Amino acid sequence: LREEKLSMNNFNAKAVKDGIVKWIREFFEQNGKGCSAVVGISGGKDSSVVAALCVEALGKDKVFGVLMPNGEQVDIDASYSLVKHLGIDYCVVNIHEAIRSLKHEIKPKLGDHWSVQTSVNLPARIRMATLYAVSQTIGGRVANTCNLSEDWVGYATRYGDGAGDFSPLSKLTVTEVKAIGRELGLPEELVEKVPTDGLCGHTDEDNLGFTYAVLDRYIRTGEIDDMHTKERIDTMHERNLFKLALMPSFEYTNPVETVVLDDKQTGYGIVSEYIKKYWEHHCTEDVIVSIEISRDGKNYECLNEVASPYDMYDVEYLNDWWEGEKYIRVTGIQGISDIKIKKL
């Protein structure tokens, strides 16, 4: 309790709850007007709070719960309790057979090897695939139910519970999520339900080696009493940062070609030549040509013209602009290389 109080300084649960509700409404207005929020219901605090927030934001008729037990789930009554409390529609999809079938197919092809991490993470990824199958079928948006504390130490499965279309709780600690759950009037047994790993029955805090209260205080204040715990948290955070980043991608930049004009050349001739070259290599595609006029290093005007192989591109007006200009930059937006035309 001491740690929770220290991490909750100046946290206004009602104001934050109202802000999230407004944000959810705005998200759906812009990214799925008329769609339903699809929430994976585990019966824990995170899915309970997200579902309740969506009900307040969209109405219970626009929230659909998906219960996804892996075989027999001893605590599934908590999930039923939540959907009944909120009055939302739901379905139950048992993922056990999907997991078993994949393991049966993959394991023999990998030298009969099946890692512990695979067993831990595959159910989360099967659940996310299930949520998207439901969402696309009914016309919905999948809610991510991760919180800041779990994300901070990598306690989420990439492309599993770490996926989703919108994330109401990802900037809030476990302690703060609980406070919002109480503000929403959720039953205390759902707010305080202890999460387990679903494999050995160990709690999250057993596996982490520290409590969420300690972690939350450290995240919000930078304060921690035990230096060994601090080192453990810092190591886990650094090791798992990649889960929160966009997928690395190769950066490709179009090459820039510079043409130096003498006094006898005109911008019109050079531009026409490059447009013709583009058409020869790109068949019948139109190209957008951006003409940027610059004096003394400052941009003064920028025109955009569509050049079509069916309609001869006319840039004769460039001749009037060319007098006294330092350079004209011509860029083909749809794939043509950047062309900088400089006058001697």
What are the functions of these language-model segments?
Residues 2-39, 53-56, 61-64, 70-72, ...:
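ATP/NTP-dependent adenylation/nucleotidyl-transfer catalytic domains that generate, transfer
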Residues 259-262, 301-311:
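Solvent-exposed serine/threonine-rich low-complexity stretches and specific carbohydrate-binding patches
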Residues 47-51, 76-80:
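Short, surface-exposed alpha-helical segments at coil->helix boundaries
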Residues 44:
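Conserved G/P- and acidic residue-centered "switch" motifs that form tight phosphate/ATP-binding loops
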Residues 275-280, 320-333:
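Noncatalytic modules at the cell exterior or secretory-pathway interfaces
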Residues 270, 333-344:
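Exposed low-complexity, polar/acidic, P/S/T/G-rich flexible segments that act as propeptides
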Residues 268-274, 312-321:
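Exposed aromatic-hydrophobic patches
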